[in-house]
């Protein structure tokens, strides 16, 4: 009984303070009324109208808004009792405020306050409450509150998806809210590197007297027109983000113009001032994959770096990549010794990783290797297979090989090649670099000495190969004698490569098989006679020695010769088939596919005639 009396006494006390507060508010203003509203909530913490009065009179404490939300079911009890109304303006989003009069609006306002306070999970949970949508006016406010949560937490794709959601036809649309949502979406698109998309969102908002661009949109797209003095902070932000987007699009003149318009009462915003002072300042661009990698979805700092994401992706694909690399190598014609050497290399790498895990030394070992042999013998394809195998084993992050040449290492003047080589290697860590004709890194003077520009690159490469012996893989390729001679230009160069894979010239049977495999997916087919002619001709070529002492098949570049012959033979076949058709003879599907002995013979002679070293061959 005494507790009930106390409660009634508290309520009566609270009501006296509340009634006095309302009277003072109307007569003397909010500052004078606030202490009475505070006294009312102290007497009865459940008096929602008193909490609303506190907020209306300038109480910006998050705890007060939380109390109002907790007791919002009692809203209007006291104002109805005395026949009065009460409302509070509360910030919702970065630059505008919502007029709070009922429980659902309190919830929307609280979600924004929670976002500002960093209580993101609570804001998200509150916005999931469908009771906040008890009024058609609340739908667009809810959209802004959710976009704002995603904006503050830098979940840029979610900002865009929220901004793009269609509102119900009955929803009440407000220009200020539309403009605020468009501004957030423009920021999001810009941070995703989608400058044109950002401009599209910005163009939906007309600032009266400053810009008119919304007319290009259809009736199904929400647009807005706001006055420059209506919401100065929003107008300044629209100008700022447009300026930063133009900078992102490399239109600096436009960027300067719009950044200069990012003012409030004629004073540049801090962000605009900083951007105008530094033309290199740009918005930070990220991607959806990075955002999705966060361990805490609300904390951008918990996202993984690009290298970590690449590592994760490689780890997930390692089994596939290893299988792909092995299959690619296995599909190559011949190369038995190379395939065996790669298999042994896999074993060595696996043991090396286990030794490193247990702290055991791996002196003298490195990822770098040499592929030596005549052209067209599968060195580049083997390098591609090694890229997949290395990535599959976790030796490198990226399976794709990067083919380089002298110009990637060497500058035009002495002193440029060292830094250029360093930059190339630093950008290639976690990758495979492949350089065919490795020896072309230097150019020789008439007396045989190497050029200084090339040697500068060689000397710096030597350092990088040792420093990063496990951080990337450098594969040099070319003729063995020329590679060996090149390695002598610096005494330490040969020691940076602890494995050499030798590629032999293809046999005549292998050349014909390469031609067959090249023709099949092109829907071309050598008949038996064509294969015999091809085999005999390749045998003749292989037994031929050029004036420079080179085997004929090496001069014709082995596997490339087979592919060139097939392509040339298809041309002779096509000419033959067209003549057949023009003569009134039927052309079958088989006719369109078959390469005859005549076609292949003409193709071989034609391809060989392009090489002057083959001029003396006797067929």
Swiss-Prot record:
Q: Is-annotated flag, keyword Cytoplasm?
A: yes
Does Acetylation appear among the keywords?
no
Fetch the SUPFAM superfamilies from UniProt.
Answer: P-loop containing nucleoside triphosphate hydrolases (SSF52540)
Tell me the superkingdom of the source: Bacteria
GO CC annotation terms, alphabetical: cytoplasm
GO MF annotation, one: ATP binding
Q: Which UniProt keywords apply?
A: ATP-binding, Cytoplasm, Nucleotide-binding
Q: What is its main location?
A: cytoplasm
The residues that the entry says bind ATP are 373-380
Gene3D superfamilies hit by this protein: 1.10.8.60, P-loop containing nucleotide triphosphate hydrolases, Tetratricopeptide repeat domain
Matching entries from InterPro entries are given as: AAA+_ATPase, AAA_lid_6, ATPase_AAA_core, CbxX/CfxQ, CbxX/CfxQ_RuBisCO_ESX, P-loop_NTPase, T7SS_EccA, T7SS_EccA1-like_N
Kindly give the PANTHER family that the UniProt entry links to this protein: AAA-TYPE ATPASE FAMILY PROTEIN / ANKYRIN REPEAT FAMILY PROTEIN, AAA-TYPE ATPASE FAMILY PROTEIN _ ANKYRIN REPEAT FAMILY PROTEIN
Task: Write out the function statement from the record.
Answer: Part of an ESX-2 / type VII specialized secretion system (T7SS), which exports several proteins. May have ATPase activity and might provide energy for the export of ESX-2 substrates.
Complex formation: Part of the ESX-2 / type VII secretion system (T7SS), which is composed of cytosolic and membrane components.
Name listed for the protein in its UniProt record: ESX-2 secretion system protein EccA2
